[in-house]
Amino acid sequence: MNIDVVLLLEQNPILLIFVVLAIGLSFGKIRFGSFQLGNSIGVLITSLIMGHLGFSFTPEALTIGFMLFIYCVGIEAGPNFFGIFFRDGKHYLILSLVVLITATWIAYFGGYYLNLDYGLAAGMMAGALTSTPVLVGAQDALNSGLAAVPRHMDLSLILDNVSVGYAMAYLIGLISMIMFAKLLPKLQKQNLSDSAQQIAQERGLGSQRKVYLPIIRAYRVGPELINWIDGRNLRELGIYRQTGCYIERIRRHGILAHPDGDAILQEGDEIALVGFPDSHARLDPSFRNGKEVFDRNLLDLRISEEEIVVKSDSIAGKRLSDLNLSEYGCFLNRVVRAQIEMPMDLDIVLAKGDVLQVSGEKSKVKGLADKIGFISVHSQMADLLAFCSFFILGILFGLVTMTFGQVSFSLGNAVGLLLSGITLGFLRANHPTFGYVPQGALNMVKDLGLAIFMVGIGLNAGSKMFQHLSEVGVQVIGLAFLVSVVPVVFAYLVGAYILKMNRALLFGAIIGARTCAPAMDVVNEYAKSTIPALGYAGTYAIANILMTLTGTIFILLS
């Protein structure tokens, strides 16, 4: 049996998609020292080669890819978008606008000066910013008819130009951003790790520690401890401040009880202490030496670890220190915002949608969750009805046409799906039983949508890529470098000398404005801290939204 592989792939577009994906994802795992190509570059290079060999791609599959991607971007941004936009994100909004306005200005006038074909500059800008949302916005504006097609040009030719520009500039944008993250910190007077340490000191940020579940140990109260207590009740003693442990139970004369703040320990009491292993190890000898007891009932406590989503209006906007976790007998392990783990900063301002990983006795963790929000649903079942319904609403919203005199205007699929995704994400953050999609499932849909979209871009661009490289390759690559680097340098100057931002936060914010996650690892390494993640999370959500709008606006201006 003879199988013509080329004919098989040409006649089976779905098979072609997954063959390119498999090869590209494998290629993306290749490392050059500490640098890894990554999934996007691997898939893009593979699809460009396949496109150059003559393989093509159906526009419908390309469309569903970018629709799923941009919709999931909206869902992820939803919980934090409004908080950043309306409350304390002034600096982050300014930096995002500086990057995008500068990039748009350079790309527009650079494309005009170089007389680039229609659509090529838009794709080049998207690639130089390593921003798929910019590309999505530009292509959707063309497909939806929002942007007029010149009479002498065909729509498919313009879309090919957009794809070619993106493919030519993407690698330039990624490498230049990583190099920026490596070089610019070295050019500062102040070391980046010193900037991070300064924020840590100003905000009472302790050193990062390993996270363990609390453990329970039981001790008998002896004469030494009674002398130390000196008649004070538990509230006056401040056991947690002294030891880092909570007293969960007391057995007195054979009776188990949960103590309140007015309780006074007596000699012979057996107490159950809950705390991290390090806290138990640091206990004063009057607590532990020769006094540990094993009492099955006293130790029978259910320690749980839950992810609590901030929802309460009375909590959002307050500092982490205002939670007074010691009153609830709970331990904070992590703070996650927009899928970025934040430093354990007691002065960080909480926002709706923030996830606090908390451990402690089960009933107390539940009590804390009832106060600040809700426990994240630990379910593998997604609310597909809500997911599909808002997807439909996004498409319908993008089809609505508004007329102003002689001018008709519609948002298009990209903006419509982005807005519906933001709405679903926002509602999910405020209503725990509505619209739940496991984060793993959301990541898979988003990554698969992006990968399919990249396959389509590469296959469509591959057939003309080398022709454009020989004709305008040097000009496009040079312009892409300027679009990638100049806005970042300008944003740095604005942030450092006008906004007076801390350098560690500033670098994270600039990378968030560029939505370039690989560069984030480089900055964290130089800062020897995760503090730059505070800035990254601040700009990431708003930048993703603005980039989609930028792609649409740019193609309208061209």
UniProtKB/Swiss-Prot annotation:
The keyword Transmembrane applies. InterPro entries: AAE_transporter, RCK_C, RCK_C_sf, Transp_YbjL_put, YidE_YbjL. It holds the Pfam family TrkA_C. It is found in: Cell membrane. GO terms for cellular component: plasma membrane. Keywords: Cell membrane, Membrane, Repeat, Transmembrane, Transmembrane helix, Transport. The chain crosses the membrane at residues 5-25, 37-57, 66-86, 92-112, 164-184, 384-404, 407-427, 441-461, 476-496, 504-524, 537-557. GO terms for biological process: potassium ion transport. One of its GO terms (molecular function) is monoatomic cation transmembrane transporter activity. It is a multi-pass membrane protein. Residues 203-290, 291-374 form the RCK C-terminal domain. It comes from Vibrio cholerae serotype O1 (strain ATCC 39315 / El Tor Inaba N16961). The keyword Repeat applies. This is Putative transport protein VC_1145. NCBIfam families: PRK04972.1, YidE_YbjL_dupl. It comes from the Bacteria.
